[in-house]
Amino acid sequence: TIDTMEIHIDHYKVASPKGRVILFHGVGGNGRMLSALALPLMRNGFEVICPDLPLYGYTRCSKNVTWQTWVSVGTEIVNHYQSTKQLPTFLFGLSAGGMLAYQTATECPQLNGLMASCILDQRNKEVTKHSAKNPYVGMAAKPALALLQRVAGRVRIPMKWIGNMKAIVNNEELAAVLMKDKKSSGARVSLAFIHTMLNPVIKTEPEDFKSCPFLLVHPAEDHWTDLKFSLLFYQRLACEKHTVILEGAGHFPIEEPGLMQQACAAFLESHL
């Protein structure tokens, strides 16, 4: 329980873990959807933590959730598990979880490494324009939400009305199934959450981030968030950084034959 929220966590345990990996989903997922990465990492000897972030999965919350709530929850989770047992700890973020992992890392300087499938700085208008459902929604979203959230911040709408959710996977049938799932891509989120996600308060700019190495594992066929938009932020990072391109993979990389898992495992082993 964090600040009255009952956070559901899928916990992959091993007898003598060599390290700990905390996986963050994005605005179209939940903890279970990260099992394709969690299970191989567990088999490689890592303890893996997959939370359902507020508004998604089985997590229960009655409070008004903002993007900062996610950052606070991520930080609390890192601190909680570090307080129970000190282990080399890494964060991984899928989709919007990439920026969440980065912002959490700025609050938790003791981390060994940071991994993300993309890292989008929504303060950049071009990023918002091209990650929205369509460019027109992207251009209108920020000014409209700035007004609406003041009077109707708690009102919830389907995230798929704003985000280009149909591009979460490069498989139309699977995308349709996911968008019907109220615990993942079909979730309803508050206007306040969307507004704060598009206007994040980033504590440490990338030029000043030096606390741990960063691995960008970006799908080559991502039809939602093109690599060039992640590079706008990634190339500014002052820390040690590495890039792996997942050939043939979509935004949620269901196609690639273990390339993400292999890249992450190699990164983890080299930074224990």
Positions of PLM-derived features:
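Alpha/beta-hydrolase-fold enzymes
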Residues: 100-186
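Catalytic nucleophile-loop/oxyanion-hole region of alpha/beta-hydrolase
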Residues: 56-85
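Short beta-strand/loop motif that positions the catalytic acidic residue
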Residues: 210, 216-218, 222
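The serine-hydrolase catalytic nucleophile loop
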Residues: 27-39
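Conserved alpha/beta-hydrolase "acid-adjacent" motif
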Residues: 223-229
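N-terminal cap/lid segment of alpha/beta-hydrolase-fold proteins
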Residues: 1-14
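Catalytic histidine-centered segment of alpha/beta-hydrolase-like enzymes
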Residues: 249-261
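Conserved alpha/beta-hydrolase
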Residues: 38-60
